[in-house]
Amino acid sequence: MATFKPLIADSLCVAYGKADVLNSVHVEINPGEITCLLGSNGAGKTTFIRALTGLTKPHAGTIQFDGLEITGLPPHRIVSMGISCIPEGRRVFPAMNVEENLLMGAYQERDRNRIRERLARVYDLFPRLKERRT
C-alpha cells in the first residue's frame, strides 16, 4: 500500500481586496484523518476550502499535498490529485442518490477495482451513507 504524506497549509494568507480573511493559517491533515472546519459566518471556512482546491489564490503561504507543492495550481490539476469539494447546501446533483454522488468523485479514475475499494472504504468510515446509498 502506498504511503501518503499529509495535506499541509502553512502560513496561509488570503484576502479579498483589502479585507484579510485568512491570516497565517496552519493546518495539517494526516492520511486517514477526518477533519472538520467549524466557525461562524465570515470566519473563513469557505475561503480556506477555496484556497485548497485552487479556486482562490493565497497571497502568502503554501499548500502541500502528498509532499508536492500545490499552491496556485489550477483547480483541474488539484482535482486530478484527489482533492475536491462539493457544497452540500447547493444541492448540486439533487436527482442523484448517495452512491451516484460519491461515484461522481471518481470520474477521472478508470480502474473499476480501485473505485470499488474506495467506495467500500467510504462506506466503512460512514456507515450511514451505505444505509442511504440508493
Question: Where are each of the predicted segments found?
Answer:
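Conserved ABC transporter NBD signature motif
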Residues: 61-68, 81, 114-119
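Conserved structural motif at the start of ABC-family nucleotide-binding domains
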Residues: 7-9, 22
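The feature captures the beta-strand-to-loop junction immediately N-terminal to the Walker
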Residues: 38-40
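Short beta-strand immediately N-terminal to the Walker A/P-loop
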Residues: 35-36, 85
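Helix-to-loop junction immediately C-terminal to a conserved catalytic motif
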Residues: 53
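ABC-type ATPase nucleotide-binding domains, specifically the catalytic core motifs of the NBD
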Residues: 17, 35, 73, 98-117, ...
